């Protein structure tokens, strides 16, 4: 609608100019024209064509300017406006003495020329300074403005909210992850997850009841320790049957990350293009890597498959097979890693006591 208004306004304006400009012709020329009315309409038609071309250019320029303004952060617009005002004020203050000087009549054009030129130059300098030092200026006013500006420019990405499922709460590892800062942003606990925890806590099955109460205790603990991070989300989807499907739908709806340690839920969510943060994958990624020659403090728990072997376990559950470790069952000793093997069941480390390596 606005595009049509710009074009029509330009056409009618130029047509009116063409219609009226005929009357500005010298009287001697008008006396030679037999049909002034026809000339007026001819001039109006010619000028309307020019008006159409200028209107199209104005409409295109307006749209480009509008898109640029929409994409420009409000902080940038504000700093440029301040720079423009300051530049114009300085221009007027500096040019005021010149306006007071007596200037001969034949040079009277100098004053308006200097006023226009000085205003344009100082306005441009003010905007340039605002672009260069605007962020520093905005930080003095609002310390959080720089982050807002970078987010608007796309330089920084906002932290998406995390949607936590029941298994992740019961697991309990979410608490140290929050404490160490590995999980940033808001953590949403949907109302239907809270209801599922309550159902488990009220279950007749002892194992389910223990899991449900553990989940509620952990949730209460992290809510008390991190009140700004934990948010109970009231969303519920009565038309969706399962809790897993509701979790995926909520994560899609708010463009969030699904926080879980459920393998099947992770696969289903990935198929639906939902970003996943699997706690088990994170634990696997941060497990220490032992290279041949590294030293371990290990307690030998049992004998291995071969007669001379002893077996122990690291804190993360990794099995360590110690050659010549049978005689150390039940005791702790220092062992040296000789090799590591990744199997479908997990990682296995082979080691030997220093005395065996020395011999």
UniProtKB/Swiss-Prot annotation:
CDD domains in the cross-refs: PIN_YacL-like
Top-level taxon in the UniProt lineage: Bacteria
PINc domain span: 163-275
Keyword Nuclease: yes
Cofactor: Mg(2+)
Enzyme Commission code(s) on record: 3.1.-.-
EC top class, as a word: hydrolase
Domain TRAM stretches: 289-350
Pfam families assigned: PIN (PF01850)
Binding site for Mg(2+): 165, 244
Entries under PROSITE patterns matching the protein: TRAM
Signal sequence bounds: none
GO molecular function, one term: metal ion binding
Gene3D superfamilies: 5'-nuclease (3.40.50.1010)
Swiss-Prot/TrEMBL keywords: Hydrolase, Magnesium, Metal-binding, Nuclease
InterPro entries linked: Nucleic_acid_metab_PIN/TRAM, PIN-like_dom_sf, PIN_dom, TRAM_dom
Stretches of the chain forming a coiled coil according to its record: none
Family, per entry: Belongs to the ycf81 family.
Function: An RNase.
The protein's name in its UniProt record: Uncharacterized PIN and TRAM-domain containing protein slr1972
Record organism: Synechocystis sp. (strain ATCC 27184 / PCC 6803 / Kazusa)
């Amino acid at each position: 609608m606005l595009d049509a208004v710009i074009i029509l306004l330009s056409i009618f304006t130029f047509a009116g100019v063409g219609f009226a400009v005929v009357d500005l012709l010298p009287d001697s020329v008008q006396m030679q024209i037999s049909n002034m009315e026809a000339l007026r309409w001819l001039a109006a038609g010619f000028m309307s064509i020019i008006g159409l071309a200028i209107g199209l250019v104005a409409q295109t320029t307006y749209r480009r300017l509008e898109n640029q303004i929409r994409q420009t952060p409000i902080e940038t617009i504000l700093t440029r406006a301040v720079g423009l005002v300051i530049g114009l004020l300085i221009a007027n203050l500096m040019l005021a003495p010149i306006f007071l000087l007596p200037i001969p009549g034949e040079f009277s054009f100098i004053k308006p020329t200097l006023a226009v030129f000085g205003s344009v130059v100082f306005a441009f300098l003010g905007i340039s300074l605002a672009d260069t030092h605007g962020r520093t200026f905005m930080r003095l006013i609002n310390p959080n403005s720089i982050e807002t500006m970078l987010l608007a420019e796309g330089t920084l990405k906002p932290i998406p909210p995390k949607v936590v499922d029941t298994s992740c709460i019961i697991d309990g590892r979410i608490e140290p992850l929050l404490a160490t800062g590995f999980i940033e942003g808001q953590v949403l606990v949907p109302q239907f997850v809270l209801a599922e925890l309550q159902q488990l806590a009220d279950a007749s099955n002892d194992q389910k009841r223990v899991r449900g109460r553990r989940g509620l205790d952990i949730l209460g603990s992290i809510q008390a320790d991190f009140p700004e991070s934990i948010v109970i989300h009231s969303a519920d989807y009565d038309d969706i049957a399962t809790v897993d499907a509701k979790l995926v739908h909520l994560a899609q709806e708010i463009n969030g990350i699904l926080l879980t340690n459920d393998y099947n839920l992770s696969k289903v969510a990935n198929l639906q293009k939902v970003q996943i943060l699997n706690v088990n994958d994170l634990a696997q990624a941060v497990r220490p890597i032992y290279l041949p020659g590294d030293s371990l403090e290990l307690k030998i728990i049992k004998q291995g498959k071969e007669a001379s072997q002893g077996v122990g376990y690291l804190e993360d559950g990794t099995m360590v097979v110690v050659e010549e470790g049978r005689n150390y069952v039940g005791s702790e000793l220092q062992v040296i890693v000789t090799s590591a093997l990744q199997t479908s069941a997990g990682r296995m480390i082979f080691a030997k006591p220093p005395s065996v390596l020395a011999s």
